[in-house]
Amino acid sequence: MTKPMRSIFFLLLAAGVVLGSGLLPARSRRARQRDKAKAASAVLAPTPPMGWNSYDSYGGDVNEQQVKANARYLADHLAIYGWKYVVVDYYWYYPSGHVKGNPVMDEYGRLLPVTNRFPSAAGGKGFKPLADYVHSLGLKFGIHIMRGIPRAAVQQNLPILGTEAHAQDIVNVLNTCSWSEAMYGVDVSKPAGQAYYDSLAKLYASWDVDFIKADDMSRARDPYGEVYHGPEIAALRNAMDHSGRPMVLSLSPGPTQLCDAEHVEKNSQMWRISNDIWDNWPELRNQFGYCRLWASHVGPNHWPDADMLPLGLLRLRGFNDGPRLSRLTHDEQITLMTLWSIFRSPLMMGGDLPTIDPFTLSLLTNQEVLAVDQHSSGNHLLFTKGHQIAWVADVPGTKQKYVALFNLGESPEEVAVTWRQLGLAGRLPVRDLWNKENLGSFDKQFSARINPHGAGLYRIGKR
């Protein structure tokens, strides 16, 4: 046998050994698992995600008992209406819930939940036991993360899992968050930078996380000089897609700029369109402008996010000003839920669920209103006339329209919409969705008296 022939023979023999050993099929299985997870990510959020986030109630100081209590309430009272995500917001890796001392990390600079607040994480279990509990209720589990790598990991120059690099090889110490001293940016143009994000996603996948809220990502060119962190967003998305587990990616904070719309749509399931909003009228009123700008970008698996719902009991822990009920009036709370629904924003309840009051509960369980958020289409601003605003959307499978009427003024006003504006004609029935009441049939137009800072939501037309 000639030397070239011997080489070919041994190559074929080696290939046969590999095939016979099952190594290639195993590798193919892993590839198929990654492909399956990536395909699942493409349809993770066919409708706007709904759930509860701990931040408005507990800041960075929520504990396991409180998360479980809110999860139980969600499962018992809200899951039937579509609420399913339970999200632990920031600083779960600091003992006090504030940037004080060193966070808890593993040997690769990956943050871990503190056991004084999350005792089930002891023994290196991370959030897996808590995720298992949430899943046992039929719900999905999420966590908040900050962009980048912990400053403590850089100071200790910890190794990057799966590489020869260390934290100081991938850090960008000039790339920081204006409102948190926990992290430095990561240079993802370096392979080890991507490897760090890969290691994070694999860790979260091992915990069976379903939802990641990534903060300090999408705000662009604000007075603090922050920029849209496109490379790190793409690196995180890539890491999640190769983690073997489908996970929703939510980007924060806003305002995200329209020039970045294509990128956020490609790399995330939801992204914030404004800065944080709290329970005050000026911030709520400002959301009308943001929603108008982003309406054309609403669609399956990419949802502009108008922020959490600051309803019910807020700021129980983690804030200096103590617990309070939402300062929004009842009319303003109806306006908030009406705008979020006609815009089709994700719905993430911020208030404490076990202490919820009957009025707030009624806002979260009105199936006719929630159907607008989850299943309407063609949502857009119809008109603005002084203090009056109207939005319209299509009712799927019918010729009907959903119509939201708003009064941003300081006194009651009659707000009217004509059939011509809606592309309708004839004598048409109108249903009040908030009051679950048929109002009768009307010719040519419909008008309603709307309270100051108030709203109405209606379904108009024949089925």
Regions found by a protein language model. Give the residues of each.
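Structural recognition of the beta-strand scaffold that forms the well-ordered cores
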Residues: 48-54, 84-89, 140-145, 210-215, ...
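Aromatic-lined carbohydrate-binding/catalytic grooves of carbohydrate-active enzymes
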Residues: 75-223
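Catalytic cores of secreted or luminal carbohydrate-active enzymes
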Residues: 335-383
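Carbohydrate-binding surface patches
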Residues: 334, 340-343, 348-350, 384-424
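N-terminal module-boundary/linker segments of secreted carbohydrate-active enzymes
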Residues: 29-68, 73
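C-terminal beta-strand-rich structural cap/linker in extracellular carbohydrate-active enzymes
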Residues: 441-463
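Glycan-recognition surfaces
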Residues: 169, 173-175, 187-189, 195, ...
